[in-house]
Regions:
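PP2C/PPM-type serine/threonine phosphatase catalytic domain
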Residues: 1-337
Length: 337
C-alpha cells in the first residue's frame, strides 16, 4: 500500500502513514486516525494469531479505540480516556474470540497517540512503539512489553542484543489475552517541529535505532520521509531473503509548541545542580575573601593607630624633657647669679 495523508482539520499537526505486507502472505497490521473532541488521534496495532485472527484482532482494536475516544466524557483526563479505550478494545477482541472458535487466541499490540494544544498523550501495550523526535534526537520512546526488554531493564543484555535476539518477538503483554489488562500511559510536552512516530516491530526491528532515527529525523518533507523509510525497511527485508514482517508506520509532525512545559531530564537536572553548587561555592568564596580583607583592613587600622600613638608619646616625652631642661638651666643660672 502507498502512503496516505492523515487528514485533519486541526491546525497544530500534520501526518502521513504507510503500511506494507512485507514478505508475508497477509498484512495483519492495522492503523487508524481521527479528529476527536479531545484532539488528533492516531493508533497503530499489530495483530497476531493463526488464520484470519491477527488481522481481525488489530482491526477490532483500531475501531474500538477510535470509537471509545470519540464517545468519551471530556471531563475525564486524557490518560484515563486512553486507558479505557484500550481496555474496551481488549474486551471486544476477547468477546469476538469467544463467539467465533476459529478466532480464539487472537491478539494484538497497540499504540495510541492523542495530541492536542496542551500535550501529546501516549498509550501502549506490547512491542509496537511510539517515538518522539526533535530532529534526530530521541526525546521519548515507549518501552517494549517483551521478554527481551525485561532483560534490558535488568541490564542483562543491550537493546541492540534484544533487537537481534531470536526471542525478540515474544511479548509479555497484548490485547485479547486476558480481561485484566495493564496499559502504559505517558504525557509528553512538545516543541514546534517535533515528530511522533508510531510503528510496529516490522519497522523498529529491521535496523539499529540510530539508523532508524536518522531516517525519521531527516529534514525532507514528511511525506517523503515516510515513503523513504517504508521503502528502505522493505528493501532490507527483501535483501535478507524475504519473509520479513509486515511494516506499518504513522508519523505526525507538530506545528506549534504545547502548553505543557517540558520537564527537565536527569542530565539537565544534574547540570543545573552543578551550576548551583558552583555559584554557591563562588559566592561563599567571595564572602570569605571580603571578611578576610575586612579583617586585614581593621588590623591595619589598629596597627596604624598604635603606631601614631607610639610616635605621639615619643614626641611628648621629648617635649617635656626639653621643658625640664630649660627650667633646670634657669634654676642653675639663678643660682649662679
Amino acid at each position: 500500500m502507498d502512503w496516505i495523508q492523515l487528514k485533519t482539520n486541526l491546525p497544530y499537526v500534520t501526518g502521513y502513514a504507510e503500511s506494507r505486507i512485507g514478505g508475508r502472505s497477509e498484512n495483519q497490521d492495522s492503523y487508524g486516525y481521527a479528529d476527536t473532541p479531545l484532539g488528533f488521534l492516531v493508533t497503530v496495532c499489530d495483530g497476531m494469531g493463526g488464520g484470519p485472527g491477527g488481522k481481525t484482532a488489530s482491526s477490532i482494536a483500531v475501531k474500538e479505540i477510535v470509537d471509545s475516544v470519540n464517545e468519551a466524557n471530556r471531563e475525564e483526563t486524557v490518560s484515563n480516556i486512553l486507558i479505557k479505550a484500550v481496555r474496551r478494545a481488549n474486551l471486544a477482541i476477547i468477546q469476538r474470540g469467544a463467539e467465533q472458535p476459529e478466532l480464539q487466541g487472537m491478539g494484538s499490540t497497540c499504540t495510541v497517540l492523542l495530541i492536542n494544544e496542551n500535550a501529546a498523550t501516549v498509550a501502549h501495550v506490547g512491542d509496537s512503539r511510539v517515538y518522539q523526535l526533535r530532529g534526530t534526537q530521541k526525546i521519548f520512546r515507549t518501552f517494549d512489553h517483551s521478554m527481551v526488554f525485561d532483560l534490558v531493564k535488568q541490564k542483562v543484555i543491550t537493546e541492540e542484543q534484544a533487537r537481534l535476539s531470536a526471542q525478540s518477538n515474544v511479548i509479555t503483554r497484548a490485547l485479547g489475552i486476558k480481561t485484566d489488562l495493564e496499559v502504559e500511559v505517558a504525557e509528553c510536552p512538545y516543541e514546534k517541529g517535533d515528530r511522533f512516530m508510531l510503528c510496529t516491530d516490522g519497522v523498529h526491528g529491521t535496523m539499529d535505532e540510530k539508523s532508524l532515527l536518522k531516517l525519521v529525523g531527516d529534514k525532507n518533507e514528511l511525506q517523503k520521509v515516510v515513503t523513504t523509510l517504508a521503502m528502505r525497511i522493505d528493501s532490507v527485508g527483501r535483501n535478507a531473503g524475504g519473509g520479513h514482517d509486515n511494516l506499518t508506520l504513522a508519523v505526525v509532525e507538530t506545528k506549534c509548541k504545547s502548553k505543557l512545559k517540558e520537564k527537565m531530564n536527569k542530565r539537565m537536572k544534574l547540570l543545573v545542580c552543578s551550576l548551583c553548587v558552583l555559584c554557591f561555592v563562588s559566592i561563599a568564596g567571595n564572602i570569605f575573601q571580603c571578611l578576610i580583607n575586612k579583617e586585614n583592613s581593621e588590623h591595619s587600622i589598629k596597627l596604624d593607630k598604635i603606631s601614631k600613638l607610639v610616635y605621639s608619646q615619643d614626641t611628648t616625652t621629648v617635649s617635656v624633657a626639653s621643658k625640664l631642661d630649660s627650667i633646670r638651666k634657669i634654676i642653675i643660672k639663678g643660682k649662679e647669679q
